[in-house]
Amino acid sequence: MRKTAVFSAKKLSLIGLAAAATCILGPLSIPIPVSPVPITLTNLVILLNIYILGYHEALTCLFVYLALGIAGLPVFSGFSGGLGKLAGPTGGYLIGFIFLVLIAGFFIDRFPSSSLFAALGIILGMTATYGFGTLWLTAQMDLSLPEALSIGVLPYLAGDAMKILLATLTGPRLQKRLAQFQ
């Protein structure tokens, strides 16, 4: 009996390319003075990866990105890497991306023709990411919950709303365009 591969060569290539895109865009960040959490494009790239790959493969891609960062490659915000970055104040948001992929990916894959459900899934996934990251930030910096929310969530809401809009508008188009190559 012949076993089939978990991922086809094409899927592995797409996962590799998506991981590379995440590693290239992930370090680009804008520090803001009121917070240890910078503005990044990482969550947008992750959302587009869900559309392009589907959420199982996007989760694999995310784990590749996190593993490379933990191994010390400078793929996290500000061209940083290492286990210390994951264990630091912003590590909860990096780990929280797992929830983003699982929740948003479920909605995007389950309701492929509904941008409303996709947006709902992305909002729920971002909320879970914010929740985990904020609790982590609270513990790491010995902050109250309102303090952590004011530096770890509030400054990012408008930008993340734009990223959600951009992902829900461009994601399906990318998905359709790249489907012909899969």
Regions found by a protein language model. Name each.
Residues M1-L17, I151-Q182:
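Alpha-helical transmembrane segments and their cytosolic interface
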Residues M1-L59:
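Hydrophobic transmembrane alpha-helices
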Residues R2, S13-L17, I24, L83-A128:
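Short helix-perturbing small/polar motifs within transmembrane alpha-helices
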Residues S8-K11, Y55-T60, F111-F117, S144-L145:
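Membrane-helix interface segments
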Residues L12, G16, A20, I24, ...:
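Generic alpha-helical transmembrane segments of integral inner-membrane proteins
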Residues G26-P38, L66-L100:
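Interfacial aromatic-anchored transmembrane helix boundaries in multi-pass membrane proteins
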Residues I52-L53, I103-F111, L174-L178:
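Structural signal for the C-terminal ends of transmembrane alpha-helices
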Residues L73-F79, W136-S150:
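Interfacial helix-loop-helix junctions of multi-pass membrane proteins
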